[in-house]
Structures are given as C-alpha cells and as structure tokens.
C-alpha cells in the first residue's frame, strides 16, 4: 500500500445514516456510485432489506470509474464492477456490454474531468455540488446545451449534510430498466441543484486526512524520507486543531487559488491537464499570477 500517494479513504458517512436521511427527505430511489467498486451498493441493499421501514427506497447499482487519464465516468445500472485504469473507449464499451448508461462526471473539473470527451457519454453531469469554483459547472452546462446532451445534477456527497443536495426527477416506473430507458429518452429533469458549503468541503478534507494518515505517512517514509518529519508535523497540527484560525485561512486560500486555476483553464484556455501532469510549479504559477 506504499506505492501510491492517493488517499484511500474518501467518505465516512455510514450506510445507516444515508438510508435514514433518504427516508426523511422522501427520496424514492438512489444510485450508489462508489469509486471503482459495487461494494457500497451491495452493503446498502443488505441493510435496507433488514429494516422494514426503509424497504420503500429503491437502491440501484452504479459505479464512478476512474479512467487512465484520472477522469471519472459514472456507470448507471451495472451489476459487475468495471475495472479502473482503462481508456475512455474501453470503459464505455464495458458499460455498454452491461446495457448500462454512461455519464461524464464533473467533466470540466480541473483535476478529474474528461472535458470535451464527455460527448462520447450518454449523459453529462452539468451541475456538481462540489464544483464551488462555479466555472466548471457553467462550462459543462454550455457544453451540454451546444451538443444537445442529456443533463443531470450530482450531489457527489462525501459528508452527511450534502446528501440529497442535488435531486433529479425521472418520469418512469421505479424500476431500473424503466429509469434507464426514460433517462435516455430525456424524461428526466434537475429538480434540485445546490452547491456544497465551504465548511462541508473542509469537513470532507478532515475526514480524508484523518482516515488516511497512516497510509500517507507510510508513503512519505518510503518515497520521500527527508520530508517525513515535516509532513507528520503538518498532519498532526491540522488534525489536532482543524478549526483553528490558521487552518481556516489556509483552507480558504486554497479554495481561492483553485478557483483561479479553474477560471484560467475553463474560461481563458490554459492547459486543462495541469493536474494530470502533476506540475506543482505550473499550478502555483497559474494560481498566483494574472
């Protein structure tokens, strides 16, 4: 587990909390889109079936697949996991083989969107709650309109308070085949689309770093031993006082700089693959200079 700097833990919301919140919000159906796995779907089905109060909620299988360029594609209606790391055409072929529906997730997000290749998907996510830079959603909406694509909104929820932040309404029977067919017939509409709050993004960051601390430190120890003490001190400092003034200022600064990068990439034509290239020099330059 020491060969990758990627954070392994992404969401700490329990299945129980998600289902009871769906019940309270009177949500009829959920697609569970965990990263590169169907395990969350299977676990949620098991929990729901063991609690009579929750059985009215329909739960359908889906996956958020990471392709070879680190972009994300949603697959709705699959029953076998689609492996990550394939190129976009291989991934879409694998989705079609299961008679499922593909959707470009947050396509113009700078770090993990597939950008104009979204045209290859059945649908496009034109509003993502975590795109608080605004530009990513604006460009996605325009791209969808220009290319007459089917649009949906996604909560992309990683903390409990953002669950149901976006809701789509579909004119169909509450059965998987009917839902997929009617989505492709443009019988869906975005019923609710609201952005995550800055505090919710900070909460997500805290969970990821706290849950993944050992993994990150092990990676640094193996690959960058000279930086281990500094990284450990920084993590310990943040995790012990995440709500301190210092970390709130740094968090707000990080969001501001990421918004500047998104504006340059999405509105001014700068290199859209800056995160893929992992060039921190370029990133810092883009965020700081006009």
Protein language model features and the residues they cover:
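Domain-core and long-helix interface of multi-subunit machines
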Residues: 1-11, 41, 77-165, 169, ...
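An N-terminally biased module of ancient metal coordination in phosphate/nucleic-acid-related enzymes
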Residues: 1-69, 92, 118, 161, ...
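Residue-level recognition of short, well-ordered coil/turn positions
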Residues: 27, 53, 100, 148, ...
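A residue-level signal for beta-strand positions that form part of recognition/binding surfaces
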Residues: 56, 72, 167
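Active-site segment of extracytoplasmic enzymes that catalyze sulfate/phosphate-ester chemistry
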Residues: 70-76
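C-terminal functional module detector
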Residues: 147-150, 160-290
